[in-house]
């Protein structure tokens, strides 16, 4: 399973590099593309066909070849992802972890592949610290101030949990369904978005560890009002 994740991570990195190269080449010729990948994918054929005023035939061929690389990488990533999802379906631990909000086959399988049943960690905070999601603490007199997360430990899993947190933050209407809606609403009022994402990723990691070690599915206590 870890081998599949390593391959997928490498392919995703290669795809990101190809996309950035396409953007860079277009930008050098005054063609500005919106950040949304879907827009770039859909608009690229038109750019190549209609912007001959700034794109030479050679440059158009270079960009077209990069677009072909992008499509091939998409297909390979999809193939590896399908294989991971097939393995997850037959793994009880992965299925339990997937009951946690924001966590799907990729995160659950990466977590189980990395820590097994999770018993190597005494508590959820230890697992979160291993991921580098626990904020540094600084004391001034009688006050304890939370600083930035340490970013130590398993960078790949940390990145996945951060992605899960950001996806949840994009859908505030669903927050009450997750069982930590009140906490999330109040945290959103006082924390910078990046700090909030890290705090939520920390919480998700702890919940996932609890679900994994206690061999039970996540059951949200639905919040009726979080105003």
Regions found by a protein language model. Give the residues of each.
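Amphipathic alpha-helical segments in well-ordered regions
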Residues: 25, 110, 160, 164, ...
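Low-complexity, acidic/Ser/Thr- and charged residue-rich accessory regions of DNA metabolism proteins
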Residues: 142, 182-227
């Amino acid at each position: 399973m870890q081998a599949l994740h390593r391959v997928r991570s490498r392919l995703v990195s290669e795809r990101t590099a190809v996309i950035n190269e396409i953007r860079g080449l277009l930008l050098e010729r005054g063609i500005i593309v919106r950040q949304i990948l879907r827009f770039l994918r859909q608009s690229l054929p038109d750019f190549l066909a209609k912007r001959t005023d700034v794109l030479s035939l050679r440059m158009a061929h270079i960009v077209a070849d990069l677009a072909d690389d992008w499509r091939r990488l998409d297909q390979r990533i999809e193939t590896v992802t399908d294989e991971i999802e097939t393995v997850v379906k037959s793994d009880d631990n992965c299925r339990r972890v997937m009951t946690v909000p924001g966590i799907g086959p990729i995160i659950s399988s990466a977590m189980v592949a990395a820590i097994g049943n999770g018993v190597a960690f005494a508590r959820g905070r230890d697992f979160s610290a291993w991921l580098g999601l626990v904020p540094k603490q600084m004391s001034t007199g009688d006050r304890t101030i939370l600083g930035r997360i340490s970013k130590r430990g398993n960078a790949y899993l940390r990145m996945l949990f951060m992605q899960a947190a950001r996806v949840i933050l994009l859908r505030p209407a669903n927050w009450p369904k997750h069982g930590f809606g009140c906490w999330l609403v109040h945290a959103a009022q006082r924390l910078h978005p990046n700090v909030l994402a890290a705090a939520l990723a920390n919480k998700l990691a702890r919940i996932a560890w609890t679900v994994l070690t206690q061999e039970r599915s996540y059951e949200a206590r639905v919040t009726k009002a979080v105003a």
